[in-house]
Structures are given as C-alpha cells and as structure tokens.
C-alpha cells in the first residue's frame, strides 16, 4: 500500500529550523524581539495599523470580545458553520451566540441573514472567511456601521486572502490563526489586527495579565519591574520560539499560497474531467484572491451512492486522509441541548456532506491524481 497521504502537512523547512535554533541560542525564548518583528511584518503584509500576537486565534477572539465589553445580556451574531471556539468564547463571557445560516455553496454568511438576526441586544457580528475565500464584506461593513455594531472578522482561514483588491486585515478588526494546518503556522499561535487604536491597546493589555507591557518591554525599555495592572487579564502571549517560525512562514506565504492555488485548480479540472458526482464549493462572485486553505467537496449519497462518513472511511482505507470543516456548531451536544429549536437548513445540509480533501503546499499533482483515482474507485464500488 502507498504511504499515507495526510489531509494537511505543515511546510516546514531548514529556514524554520534555523530560526528556532537562533532563538534558543539567543537566551530569550519567550515573548521578545521575534514577536515585535512578527507584528511589524504582519502589519506590512496586511496593511493593518496594529497587529498583536497571541498564543492562538481562540485567545485573540477572547480578549477582543472582552475589550469590546461583550457580556451577559449581549448577543453576538455568528455562523454555526464554524469551529466551536467562537461559540464557546461568547458563551463563557455570558453572552448569547445567535447562530445564522450560510450560503449553500459558499458556506459564508450573507448580509441578509445578518440583518434578519439583529436585535436591540446585538453587540457584535463575527463573519467567517471560509476555506480561504473572503466573505462579501462591503454590505456587512455598511450594515454594522449603520447599526453601530462591532464587526470582528474571523480570518483564521484567510491569511493571504484579499477582497476587492484589499488584503483581509487591512481595515477593521480581524483575527488570524497560526495553527498547525493553517497557511502560515508556528504550531500554535494567532494574530489580532485592528485599525482601532483604543481596541489595540486594550487587547495588548488583556493578553498579558492586564499589564499592557511584557517582560521584554520592561527589560529593554527600562520600565519598573512591577508594571501597573490596569484590568484583570490573561496570559495569552506568544513565545519567540513560535514567532520565529511564523516569521519565516509569513515570508514564504506568497509562494505557499501559489502552490495551494495550483493544486486547487488541478483538483477542479480533474473533478470535472472525470465527471465525479462531488460538488466543490463555489468561489465568490465578488473580486477576490483565494488563499485555498481548504479544498472542500460535498458528498451527496443520492448522487454518489455513498454518504460522507463512508467516503471518509473508504479514503482512510486507501491511506488517504480527509477532514470535516465543520460539523455545525448547533448540532454539537451542548449547543443542540441549549438551542433545541434552532434549524439552519443550508448549514445542516452541508454539515452532513462536506469533506476536506488533502491540500498542502508540498503535495504534487500525482498526489491529486491519487485522490481522484480513489474517489472514482469508491463510487464505482
């Protein structure tokens, strides 16, 4: 049997290994000069005014919502078609997640669905850029501005994504992920970007004990050893070991995303050429640059003769990995029991059928051919 083809694999090379070695030899391995450089370089890459490195996108979402004052009595609009961390954070802050449906073929929220969900208690909207494609931001921004509601973009899938010629993160507030499967990785990490000076200051304080200053700042800038705690905060800072990896990855991003785009185009070509009964997501109609974080197909048993779970198992039996992005949050036990009446037709239809095929920069067209051959064999059986 052929070697296992994983669903995802980080593109780690000698440069990342050398960067980590340099940090280990430097004597400063926690938050320090690598973080500062990463934040500056991320601002340059996205055009953002402020970038604040954190230990995960989840941590970034937590301190951002806290900085906005989200709490009991508030509602936050978000898709159910997302990773549950966002719902968990909203819930843990005492607020209510208002889960809305997505477009059937984009898996992204629409301005119409958001507008229908707004109430006097709505405090924030969190649209999700999905699989590397950008949500249609202009009408959502206009809606949020008219209503005076905070807008926080979940950009965990969108490093290198652009909307109407503008990098995601250049305007407003967005949160990126450096998790192991993301287009830029440092194993675990994230970045909050914003053009709001006050929000940036609050996020920076909340992510480090409420101090607004870290150990490296105190040493290099001569501040008092015991800085003032201005508000209770968390320890969500990113270590320089991780930041060094992320810096190398960020420099490689155009090349890495170009490889992903070529592989995605080849997948689309082969699916069409072999007339396989699997529907990929539609690319957005609005001008954009796709980061191709994921390559997702929908497996409908009525068309293919096999359901999604069986398809994933059959791929596994052929030593091919796959993923599920995502099981709808409102179908998870806690949220299912908390919101038993909630029905989201397009989200549920997709949640039962979506399958993420292998896609990572070090893949080859031969690997895609192998996946396509496996899909063909599975449906023919």
Curated annotation (Swiss-Prot):
GO MF term (any one): pyridoxal phosphate binding
Record-listed E.C. numbers: 2.6.1.87
Cofactor(s) in the UniProt record: pyridoxal 5'-phosphate
Superkingdom: Bacteria
GO biological process entries: lipid A biosynthetic process; lipopolysaccharide biosynthetic process; response to antibiotic
Matching CDD domains: AHBA_syn
Pathway: Nucleotide-sugar biosynthesis; UDP-4-deoxy-4-formamido-beta-L-arabinose biosynthesis; UDP-4-deoxy-4-formamido-beta-L-arabinose from UDP-alpha-D-glucuronate: step 2/3; Bacterial outer membrane biogenesis; lipopolysaccharide biosynthesis
Catalytic reaction annotation: UDP-4-amino-4-deoxy-beta-L-arabinose + 2-oxoglutarate = UDP-beta-L-threo-pentopyranos-4-ulose + L-glutamate
Pfam families recorded: DegT_DnrJ_EryC1 (PF01041)
Gene3D superfamilies: Aspartate Aminotransferase, domain 1, Type I PLP-dependent aspartate aminotransferase-like (Major domain)
Keywords assigned: Aminotransferase, Antibiotic resistance, Lipid A biosynthesis, Lipid biosynthesis, Lipid metabolism, Lipopolysaccharide biosynthesis, Pyridoxal phosphate, Transferase
GO (cellular component) term, any one: membrane
Modified residues (N6-(pyridoxal phosphate)lysine): 182
UniProt xrefs under NCBIfam families: PRK11658.1
Biological role stated in the UniProt entry: Catalyzes the conversion of UDP-4-keto-arabinose (UDP-Ara4O) to UDP-4-amino-4-deoxy-L-arabinose (UDP-L-Ara4N). The modified arabinose is attached to lipid A and is required for resistance to polymyxin and cationic antimicrobial peptides.
Subunit: Homodimer.
Similarity comment text for this entry: Belongs to the DegT/DnrJ/EryC1 family. ArnB subfamily.
Protein name: UDP-4-amino-4-deoxy-L-arabinose--oxoglutarate aminotransferase
């Amino acid at each position: 049997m052929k070697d296992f083809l994983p669903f995802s694999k980080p593109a780690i090379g000698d440069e990342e290994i050398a960067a980590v070695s340099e940090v280990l030899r430097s004597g400063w391995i926690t938050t320090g000069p690598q973080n500062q450089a990463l934040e500056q370089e991320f601002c340059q890459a996205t055009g953002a005014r402020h970038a604040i490195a954190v230990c995960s996108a989840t941590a970034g979402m937590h301190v951002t919502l806290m900085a906005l004052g989200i709490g009991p009595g508030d509602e936050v609009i978000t898709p159910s078609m997302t990773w549950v961390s966002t719902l968990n954070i909203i819930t843990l802050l005492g607020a209510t997640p208002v889960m809305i449906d997505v477009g059937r073929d984009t898996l992204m929220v629409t301005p119409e669905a958001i507008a229908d969900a707004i109430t006097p208690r709505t405090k924030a909207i969190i649209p999700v850029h999905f699989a590397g494609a950008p949500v249609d931001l202009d009408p959502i921004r206009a809606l949020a501005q008219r209503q005076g509601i905070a807008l926080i973009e979940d950009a965990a899938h969108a490093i290198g994504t652009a909307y109407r010629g503008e990098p995601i993160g250049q305007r407003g507030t967005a949160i990126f992920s450096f998790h192991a499967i993301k287009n830029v990785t440092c194993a675990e990490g994230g970045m909050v970007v914003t053009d709001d000076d006050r929000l940036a200051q609050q996020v920076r304080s909340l992510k480090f004990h409420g101090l607004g200053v870290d150990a490296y700042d105190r040493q290099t800038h001569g501040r008092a050893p015991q800085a003032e705690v201005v508000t209770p905060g968390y320890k969500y800072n990113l270590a320089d070991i991780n930041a060094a990896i992320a810096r190398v990855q960020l420099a490689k991003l155009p090349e890495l995303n170009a490889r992903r785009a070529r592989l995605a185009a080849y997948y689309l070509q082969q699916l069409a050429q072999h007339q396989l009964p699997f529907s990929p997501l539609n690319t957005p109609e609005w001008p954009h640059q796709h980061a191709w974080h994921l390559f997702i197909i929908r497996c409908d048993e009525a068309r293919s003769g096999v359901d999604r779970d069986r398809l994933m198992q059959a791929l596994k039996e052929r030593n091919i990995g796959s993923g599920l992005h995502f099981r709808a949050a409102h179908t998870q036990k806690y949220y299912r029991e908390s919101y038993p009446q909630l029905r989201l037709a397009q989200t549920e239809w997709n949640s039962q059928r979506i399958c993420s095929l292998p896609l990572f920069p070090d893949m080859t067209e031969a690997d895609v051919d192998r996946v396509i051959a496996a899909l063909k064999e599975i449906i023919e059986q």
